[in-house]
Amino acid sequence: MRLIIVSGRSGSGKSTALDVLEDNGFYCIDNLPAGLLPQLAEDALINTELLQPKVAVSIDARNLPSHLTRFPELLEEARARNIQCDVLFLDADEDMLLKRFSETRRRHPLTNANRSLAEAIRVESDLLGPIADLADLKIDTTNLNLYQLRDSIKLRLLNQPEPGTAFLVESFGFKRGMPVDADLVFDVRCLPNPYWKPELREHSGLDQPVIDYLAAQPDVEDMYNDISGYLLKWLPRFAASNRAYVTIAIGCTGGHHRSVYITERLGQHLQQTLKNVQVRHRDL
């Protein structure tokens, strides 16, 4: 039995997440009262009509505040049923949430005559704090379009060949912001930049000319060896501590050359010693 709890601030992509899960065989329930979570887990577990039952529910700020405050206790009760229970928390920065509500002209569930949209978003953050604190996986949707969000959910939640900690090695560009859901961040902007080579500028770190250029740089090799040595030593400790998800982010200026090259090499190397290692290039 697998239960995925989807939460997050309004406008962050919860409906999209439920759509993806439903498309992949999950029985989905929107806006479940949090107080019913243990009973739902019990009912789904004993439902003999479902083979390998998969259930996904969204729990958001429309719940009773007292139920949201009790979420840690309710989650513990659900997990006591001996089921796999993952908490996915989606979020975006406040400016992006304001922009999305402005574009769609939808009403925020917590706005009223005495509370502005910006105030409602901040109140919602406080209400959902107990869920965010216990999230197994957080996805920042600020810079993701609909299709990228769908791909990210499928990659992180549904593409796990074996049980255990799921590791994601992700490249990114600092000019578009650092991924807020990263557990470990490595800055490789000090390395030689292929962007300043006219013949390499239009290529990415996946292309052989850039690979050859970076592989020949001593500083690049030293940086790669230091990062890979650190990860090979400490990632197994993360797995041993029962972490469900670990994201390793490698950043350069634009997210096209250096970070992509390092990320690809690290992903291939880590896949030889760890299970469930995935690679993603955010800004390609």
UniProtKB/Swiss-Prot annotation:
ATP binds at residues 8-15. The keyword Cytoplasm does not apply. This is Nucleotide-binding protein PputGB1_0956. GTP binds at residues 60-63. Displays ATPase and GTPase activities. Belongs to the RapZ-like family. Keywords: ATP-binding, GTP-binding, Nucleotide-binding. One of its GO terms (molecular function) is ATP binding. PANTHER family: RNASE ADAPTER PROTEIN RAPZ. Transmembrane segments: none annotated.
